[in-house]
Amino acid sequence: MATKVFPSFSKGLAQDPTTRRIWFGIATAHDFESHDGMTEELVYQKIFASHFGQLSIIFLWTSGNLFHVAWQGNFEQWVQDPLHVRPIAHAIWDPHFGQPAVEAFTRGGATGPVNIATSGVYQWWYTIGLRANQDLYNGSLFLSILSALFLLAGWLHLQKNFRPSLSWFKDAESRLNHHLSGLFGISSLAWTGHLVHVAIPASRGQRVGWDNFLTTLPHPQGLAPLWTGNWAAYAQNPDSASHIFSTSQGSGQAILTFLGGFHPQTQSLWLSDMAHHHLAIAVIFVLAGHMYRTSFGIGHRLSDILDSHVAPSGNMGGGHRGLFETINNSLHFQLGLALASVGTICSLVAQHMYSLPPYAYLANDFTTQAALYTHHQYIASFIICGAFAHGAIFFIRDYDPEQNKGNVLARMLDHKEAIISHLSWVSLFLGFHTLGLYVHNDVMQAFGTPEKQILIEPVFAQWIQASHGKALYGFDVLLSSSGSVAFSASQTLWLPGWLDAINNNSNSLFLNIGPGDFLVHHAIALGLHTTTLILVKGALDARGSKLMPDKKDFGYSFPCDGPGRGGTCDISAYDAFYLSIFWSLNTVGWVTFYWHWKHLTLWQGNVAQFDESSTYIMGWLRDYLWLNSSQLINGYNPFGMNSLSVWAWVFLFGHLIYATGFMFLISWRGYWQELIETLVWSHEKTPIANLVQWVDKPVALSIVQARLVGLVHFSVGYIFTYAAFLIASTSGKFG
């Protein structure tokens, strides 16, 4: 029996006598469309089955979180005193630890070295009604079983008799019905049920478990108000402002409210407001999922909806005609839309998690807030770049000019020059003006005349904040004007709670902004527009440009079209994606620097530092980066080590990975080929070393692959470096 040679999905690659076999095999492992013997139906079936595997991994991971906190954490102690006990993620078992290390990492009331949790899981589990380790073990066991079931389901759907057909996958209306009504709608309804039946009673000191949840009414009147139409009863008698969370002291009976603002003690949104929100979402999505025609011949066909989207003026060509077939037959288009949506949502999660904290006491755990914000912004930036990458692949592999004649897609391609040049102009304008202001202010600081800085108040943004009810700026408008219709309309509902929150300086809702915010806002706008320019140009030029009209014939990633055809290097759609990641990381750096520094000064009661130092570049370098890195360069000192030592090491390690990236990025392929050949020669001539023979002849990475390897090192190093800086500088100050 012949041994199977990697990659099994490509006979051609498997016969390659060089190390290219390994690298190209890894690079194309997930490009199902390019595999030998692949059919359209099989691609859909493989992706469908892999979704179950993905969910299985997610459930296993969350199960592990629950299990390790229950086993090695201090959840029950934390629940007794959330503000003073540090939450433990898990124990550290490390044979290299000497006594100083053991002492440094033994904290949070533990008996040995532990890691502190900065993910917010303690706050989340506490808010949703978990109180004991047994609750965590139960959740862990349930998710482990679910994980095994999903793994089995994935395997099952790969078996011949259980593979869905292509027509099943392309039944868009039924899928929308399932996803909107089933997944979004019913799960939101179920979550409302959990909040009402378990979380809200727990917040009022009442334990509801598997043994008593069928006999414990979440509201004294039960379902009577629902059947009689007296829904307002569920909002009457809410928790009072003096309510002590997790006790009956000051608690009410309301389960679905619209109080607005935050619970005064926990500084998080009211649980009854969140239950109301999820119920509303459930109703909307259950209805939305039933708008489309499935088995019963009622409702809309998506193709009819899209085909009727043609502007009556005739000025917008074919509108959405032909889009249904195009999208429904292109997995890359669908993935692009999904990634764009999820990326945007992920960024919104980052923004709302700190400004409107949903979990009890999250607002008091500064390191966790910083970690969650940074994590979600980084994830969002990568996902959104991926949306454009798959958009470009769609244009190369799936776009049919005949099918889309004159519609919105064709029109985007027809006037791409106007789109790209406008984006280019905006990026240049933002870049030169913002940098010009920063540099002018730097020079004025350097020459000792800070009063000559150009400082611009963000009046439009302040006006928007004022219209939402912020009184500080003195704009008498909308919600900040007691005489406005908007003010009086909501006065009896959510407005008092909201106004109290927005004008309270102890939270992060609509922070006070000034000239430093104005400048960094425009720096971030520059980053966003430049990233967008690179991505949009990459997608719109993916099929061809004036320089290379036949680009689509070369695929998504190609280095050049050989010698003798100038200008064809570095213009593939992949090159645009590759460049966009650098700009994306640059932008997310500015975003997180801004958020973190502004919050550090807010938490320390030292907002003047940000206001004064953020108007010039030297202020950012000196008073944010240098000043806050002291914890990182002090991890090891003559007095031994401390609990920040690991972050000091990660900080250095991150720089090392980042720097390694440049070895792949700033080097010509021929140089590496010559170097490898020299190394191979020296091995073959050296006794003992020449006992090891290569099966594959070593060759250098292709230009495209070296770019990928360099980009990955650059990104990973960048992330490690900033993560270490963020966590060490925040936890070093606030514990």
Swiss-Prot record:
GO molecular-function term, one example from the UniProt record: 4 iron, 4 sulfur cluster binding
UniProt entry tagged with the keyword Iron-sulfur: yes
Identify the EC number(s).
1.97.1.12
What family is reported? Belongs to the PsaA/PsaB family.
Task: Could you list this entry's UniProt keywords, alphabetically sorted.
Answer: 4Fe-4S, Chlorophyll, Chloroplast, Chromophore, Electron transport, Iron, Iron-sulfur, Magnesium, Membrane, Metal-binding, Oxidoreductase, Photosynthesis, Photosystem I, Plastid, Thylakoid, Transmembrane, Transmembrane helix, Transport
The opening ranks of the lineage are: Eukaryota, Viridiplantae, Chlorophyta, core chlorophytes, Chlorophyceae
The residues that the entry says bind chlorophyll a B1 are 655
GO BP annotations listed: photosynthesis
Question: Which NCBIfam families has this protein been placed in?
Answer: psaB
The name this protein goes by in its record: Photosystem I P700 chlorophyll a apoprotein A2
- Give the record's cofactor note, including how many are bound: P700 is a chlorophyll a/chlorophyll a' dimer, A0 is one or more chlorophyll a, A1 is one or both phylloquinones and FX is a shared 4Fe-4S iron-sulfur center.
Annotated transmembrane regions: 47-70, 136-159, 176-200, 274-292, 331-354, 370-396, 418-440, 518-536, 576-597, 644-666, 708-728
| Protein purpose | PsaA and PsaB bind P700, the primary electron donor of photosystem I (PSI), as well as the electron acceptors A0, A1 and FX. PSI is a plastocyanin/cytochrome c6-ferredoxin oxidoreductase, converting photonic excitation into a charge separation, which transfers an electron from the donor P700 chlorophyll pair to the spectroscopically characterized acceptors A0, A1, FX, FA and FB in turn. Oxidized P700 is reduced on the lumenal side of the thylakoid membrane by plastocyanin or cytochrome c6.
This protein's assembly is summarised as:
The PsaA/B heterodimer binds the P700 chlorophyll special pair and subsequent electron acceptors. PSI consists of a core antenna complex that captures photons, and an electron transfer chain that converts photonic excitation into a charge separation. The eukaryotic PSI reaction center is composed of at least 11 subunits.
What positions does the entry give for chlorophyll a B3 binding?
Answer: 663, 671
Q: Which reaction does it catalyse?
A: reduced [plastocyanin] + hnu + oxidized [2Fe-2S]-[ferredoxin] = oxidized [plastocyanin] + reduced [2Fe-2S]-[ferredoxin]
* Species assigned in the record: Stigeoclonium helveticum (Green alga)
Spell out the subcellular localization from the entry. Answer: Plastid, Chloroplast thylakoid membrane
> What EC class is this?
oxidoreductase
